[in-house]
Amino acid sequence: MRVNDNQPFDLVTNYQPAGDQPQAIKKLVSGIEQGNRNQLLLGVTGSGKTYTMANVIAQTQRPTIVMAHNKTLAAQLYGEFKAFFPNNAVEYFVSYYDYYQPEAYVPSSDTFIEKDAAINDHIDQMRLSATRALLERRDAIIVASVSAIYGLGDPEAYMKMLLHVVEGDRINRDDLIRRLVEMQYTRNELEFLRGTYRIRGEILDVFPAESDQFAIRIELFDDEVDSIRWFDPLTGKMQRKVPRVTIYPKSHYVTPKDNLSRAIETIKDELQDQLKFFREHDKLLEAQRIEQRTRYDLEMMQQLGYTNGIENYSRHLSGRSPGAAPPTLFDYIPEDALLIIDESHVTVPQIGAMYKGDRSRKENLVNYGFRLPSALDNRPMKFEEWERIVPTTVFVSATPAKYELEKSDQIVEQVVRPTGLIDPEIEIRPVLTQVDDVLSEINIRKEMDERVLITTLTKRMAEDLTSYLKEYGVKVAYLHSDIDTVERVKIIHELRTGVYDVLVGINLLREGLDMPEVSLVAILDADKEGFLRSERSLIQTIGRAARNIKGKAILYADRMTDSMQKAIDETERRREKQIEFNKIHGITPRSAVRQKVKEIDTGEVFNDDDIEGKISEQARALSADERHILADPKLFAKHMSKLEKEMLKASKELQFEQAARLRDEILRLKAQMLH
């Protein structure tokens, strides 16, 4: 059922491909059209890889999943693609848990830990919106985290539950309500929230689970659909009249009645088998435990159609065989879809790691009678299962790993930047005088109003260096793992605006540290082999100075390691190619300028400085109570629910100014939590 097959991807931008972008776009598009299953875009820092991806999507016109390795990067990509494709369906699919404690059993202390979670209502809505977009239209881009490989409701069962309402159709009001209840919608006459409905005579209002703004009003007359309208649930203002509407289930785990009846019988059969096994092995406590828990769940499913933890019965509900791969987001995409894996050297290993951690926890639950063995099939995909199901793939990385290099049918380089900037010049200096040498380099950069990043190997070294630099009057900040996201963004903003001149850290490979103001990266103890001094890490760290026309990297080392040599050789190769390109085309390098991006929640457009400034202002403006609420996901969820109730109450009482103020407060706190 696709209602929007003809809408093309419409790339909206003032830029034209430049540098290596035109040839990279051409090669990738050609490779996709020729049937290459896997390709690699090897793009250096600051070469505009996201813009290249956007052009590939626009030229191939394929529904696309863009995978990132964490929520922060996914949110950043979502904002960028939303700006590139304002007329298409750009959606966001990440884990909807603000807080998640999975159920677990610790045999050594005989401790059972109940599942405890706080679900982010806004992200839940965005996930439902993402699957709706994939089912309804081809012009869909889904920006997802590794959450995409976790079990999701079966798409066939989900599609069976769709409710189509057409103007002029004959339908009984009670039948309509019954269908909504089967789709897990609840009646609520007091609070009209997402996933609820209300009845006023022959008028039925439904707030779709995937909608973030508008609700549906269905007016019946003598068992006939008289009119269908979209309206604003806050103000009651009508938006538009439509001839038909499709209402989607409230959850991905919704199940048709016949599937549920069949599942209940197969769960009973499995329970009997497990009881027999426990009794034969004289495990009477486990037998009692599994019988009590399972019978309670079955009763809930018979009475209400669902139960807490229903995902543990997903194998029965979907009718899959034992050990079969779970349905995931990838089951919702068409066969000719495109998958782009950003920062693939980090994202791909994550995909492989998810299954093992999940399995060991669940085995304890099964062995000690807390769950049936079929719960083991409620899991993320195994790596080999993921490999079998993925569509045409483009890996994107500045430093690809062995897997992507070996797997790719074509490796496309994007070394020349649109700005003409060349990779930083590299110098090697002795370790003995590294601290004093760094201090003199900082003073040189300070005179030119430029910034410095320094990376150390240990926390102790970073702390000592920060203290030493402060003694000499250097405006320095120390970025470490204990700093939360809001504070981190604030520090980065203050480095860019000159509050600090120097940033000291251990791992400078995280997002947000590509700043045009940084002209020097100093790598202390560069000859100590290890994760932070591997070839890939060195190349990426050196690249932190690549957005400045005077970019330079100093490696402090007493010997040349293999990793250092490879990183230097690769950087020199890129520099030669970039310099030659600039010479042939008469390009004068210019420092990078960060483009405008859309914020994920408010939809407003700010440039990078505005966003960071706005967040740091919010951070400073937070009261002690608000900081306490933001630090505890459970408190945050309760507080948001309270504010939403107050907003709807104010709206019902026609106090629209108060409702608008509460709405802005909700958006402000949501943005704060996301960042």
UniProtKB/Swiss-Prot annotation:
InterPro entries: Helicase/UvrB_N, Helicase_ATP-bd, Helicase_C-like, P-loop_NTPase, UVR_dom, UVR_dom_sf, UvrB, UvrB_inter. Residues 637-672 form the UVR domain. Residues 30-417 form the Helicase ATP-binding domain. It is found in: Cytoplasm. Residues 434-601 form the Helicase C-terminal domain. One of its GO terms (molecular function) is ATP hydrolysis activity. ATP binds at residues 43-50. Keywords: ATP-binding, Cytoplasm, DNA damage, DNA excision, DNA repair, Excision nuclease, Nucleotide-binding, SOS response. Its main location: cytoplasm. One of its GO terms (cellular component) is cytoplasm. A motif (Beta-hairpin) lies at residues 96-119. Belongs to the UvrB family. NCBIfam families: PRK05298.1, uvrb. Forms a heterotetramer with UvrA during the search for lesions. Interacts with UvrC in an incision complex. The UvrABC repair system catalyzes the recognition and processing of DNA lesions. A damage recognition complex composed of 2 UvrA and 2 UvrB subunits scans DNA for abnormalities. Upon binding of the UvrA(2)B(2) complex to a putative damaged site, the DNA wraps around one UvrB monomer. DNA wrap is dependent on ATP binding by UvrB and probably causes local melting of the DNA helix, facilitating insertion of UvrB beta-hairpin between the DNA strands. Then UvrB probes one DNA strand for the presence of a lesion. The beta-hairpin motif is involved in DNA binding. This is UvrABC system protein B.
